[in-house]
Amino acid sequence: MARTLFLLALTLPGLVHAQPSRLNCRDGVDAPPRLFPVQNVWGLAQYPSRDAEWSEERKVQEIAKAGFDAFDVWAGGASDADFARWIALGKKHGIEVGVETEVLKPEDFAPAVAAAKRLGSVYLDAHVGTSFTSEADAEALLRGLVEHCRSAGVPLVIQTHRGRVTQDLLRSVAYAKAVPDLRFDLDLSHYFVAGEIGGPLGPDAEAAFAILMERAIMLDARLSNGEQVQVDHRNPAYAAQRDRFAAMWKRTMKDWLRTAARGDVFPFRIELGPPDYAILGPDGREISDRWEQQKDLRSLVIRLWNEAVSETGAGEPYRR
């Protein structure tokens, strides 16, 4: 029955449509649509090791030196001192600040928007609800958040994540149908591991992902092999998965470029997590250098973006 309802949802009119540019992220610069690479500070947690973790300033310094346009912070529960420190770090290192936070109830709408405005973020990335939020409550929460952000003039992206209302493809497609202005920060890795997708996509998954890719105005870079949520894309053993993710990322970029307008930016965030996202060896150390992975992912993302620009004839190549 569930599969029948899912296939019916995929055929309903109006489910897939090009996103209007007014919902895209913008940074106020009058320029062709362009890429906006972001590195999550959390991606450097416990780096280079749990016992010798870089300071927050060192992390931001390294992120700026690597050529990212912004560093991303978790703003939920942040203090005035946190906001002041992040703003100062951004100014000192010539880099912008992106905002990620949690929305569990309508009372969370205003603080989330205030955080994005305070930090001047080009997006508000929201982790919405939990895996136990009912479909009806989730839809109401998403609809309310979309309306609140539209009124406030803040570009909203809903992160696709395990343990949230977007934890599975079936429900995420249903929300996309129910809330036409819903836009996603699409992290494919969570869907691949939640659905144990280790090989080529089946027709149901292909159809569902196509919907979410058309609705994505931001992407997260993490590679899953269908069993682990995070594996090293440089490992030849995962070449097929790397190529599959790269193709899906580029397709999403091309979908976005076809309707983007001047001043629009496409955030692509790198955020490889510390253990237990990262895999540990017998010596208790990560089996791969996570920062080197993330810098290499940035290079891959830029190559894919420039290919998408060339193939669509839209947007601006990324040259930084």
Regions found by a protein language model. Name each.
Residues 58-62, 81-88, 92, 111-118, ...:
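Alpha-helical scaffolding segments of alpha/beta enzyme cores, especially the outer helices
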Residues 93-184:
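Active-site acidic/histidine proton-transfer and metal-coordination neighborhood
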